[in-house]
């Protein structure tokens, strides 16, 4: 699978179109266009191609904001999935509430992790992960069960990762984020550390 790391709106769209069989990572660094807008353009492209099995995973506090912006700026319908709406869907007879017809599913990290099997079975075509730095500890395995559950549930799904702070404390955070997209890009943790620690040392010299 191809992996594109992009920094602006043009690169984002070009990469999204060129890597139809690949996976996409996005860090919205443009000073003029917000990450929600950039992601919205990718979502709109998928929607126009009738690829509508889409999920957005975001902090709980941002779910309504995502829903409003999708409707107001891109005319895209969405469905916020939480404990209450999940139960209501089940009562209506929907065996997997993550499967919504012509609606983008919006849910929280915690809820996606809790229902990771249902997320996987929904077979999403695209996932947008907002504030993706929350998954940067994925490389720690059992120490980050939420990150692992989400990454595993979306293992066959194309991903757009949105974050303004991909790196805070360690280069391993970059390793963790990229591994969410594809476990094989950097190899294992040891090879990553060997390759990039030597690069940092060489640069410093």
Task: Show where each model-derived region lies.
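Hydrophobic residues on the short alpha-helix immediately C-terminal to a glycine-rich phosphate/catalytic loop
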Residues: 42-46, 66, 177
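SF2 helicase/translocase NTPase motor core
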Residues: 1-4, 13, 36, 47-146, ...
């Amino acid at each position: 699978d191809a992996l594109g790391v992009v920094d602006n709106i043009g690169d984002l769209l070009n990469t999204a179109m060129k890597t139809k069989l690949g996976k996409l990572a996005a860090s919205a660094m443009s000073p003029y266009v917000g990450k929600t807008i950039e992601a919205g353009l990718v979502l709109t492209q998928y929607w126009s191609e009738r690829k509508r099995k889409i999920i957005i995973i975001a902090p709980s506090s941002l779910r309504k904001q995502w829903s409003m912006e999708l409707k107001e700026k891109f005319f895209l319908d969405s469905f916020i999935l939480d404990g209450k709406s999940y139960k209501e869907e089940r009562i209506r007879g929907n065996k997997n509430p993550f499967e919504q017809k012509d609606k983008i599913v919006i849910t929280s990290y915690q809820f996606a992790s809790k229902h990771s099997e249902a997320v996987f079975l929904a077979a999403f075509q695209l996932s947008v992960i907002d504030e993706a730095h929350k998954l940067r500890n994925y490389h720690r395995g059992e120490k980050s069960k939420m990150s692992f559950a989400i990454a595993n549930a979306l293992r066959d799904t194309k991903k757009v990762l949105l974050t303004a702070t991909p790196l805070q404390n360690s280069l391993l955070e970059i390793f963790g984020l990229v591994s969410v997209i594809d476990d094989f890009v950097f190899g294992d943790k040891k090879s990553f550390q060997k390759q990039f620690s030597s690069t940092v040392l060489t640069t410093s010299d």
